[in-house]
């Protein structure tokens, strides 16, 4: 089933997201101050409805049997992407994703929920890396069935 969701295009595309922005967060205020030297536009430039596709459906459509690595960088929408893979996760060896702890992106989940979900599906966290200058970490999980 395809559904539509509002996508927010930011003035600097690396932060475009399906999630709402917390304009009162300390991180947003600091980021906006720095970006204002280069870009005088509003932070959210436009929004539009986007048809979502799930990884489960794309695996089927493309007739994929497995994936060595799934890299997810969706600015607060990572858990939705992972859940959208459903029963195809068992065919993915590594999952790499980032998680923001800075409160700028309003997410509908916490990191512990992703960790619990992947752990229940036989994934194990093998790497946690803090990104410089912000409260964001990258995580790599391995599928223990495919180790």
Regions of interest found by a model, annotated:
Residues 1-147:
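Phosphate/nucleotide-binding beta-alpha loop and adjacent structural elements of enzyme active sites
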């Amino acid at each position: 089933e395809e559904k539509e969701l509002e996508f927010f295009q930011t003035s600097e595309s690396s932060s475009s997201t399906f999630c709402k922005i917390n304009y009162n967060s300390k991180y947003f205020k600091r980021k906006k101050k720095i970006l204002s030297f280069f870009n005088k536009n509003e932070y959210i430039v436009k929004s539009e409805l986007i048809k979502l596709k799930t990884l489960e459906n794309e695996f089927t459509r493309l007739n994929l049997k497995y994936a060595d690595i799934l890299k997810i960088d969706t600015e607060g929408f990572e858990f939705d992407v992972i859940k959208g893979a459903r029963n195809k996760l068992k065919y993915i060896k590594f999952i790499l994703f980032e998680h923001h702890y800075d409160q700028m992106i309003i997410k509908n989940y916490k990191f512990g929920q992703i960790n619990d979900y992947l752990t229940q599906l036989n994934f194990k966290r093998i790497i946690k890396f803090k990104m410089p200058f912000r409260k964001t970490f990258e995580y790599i999980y391995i599928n223990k069935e495919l180790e």
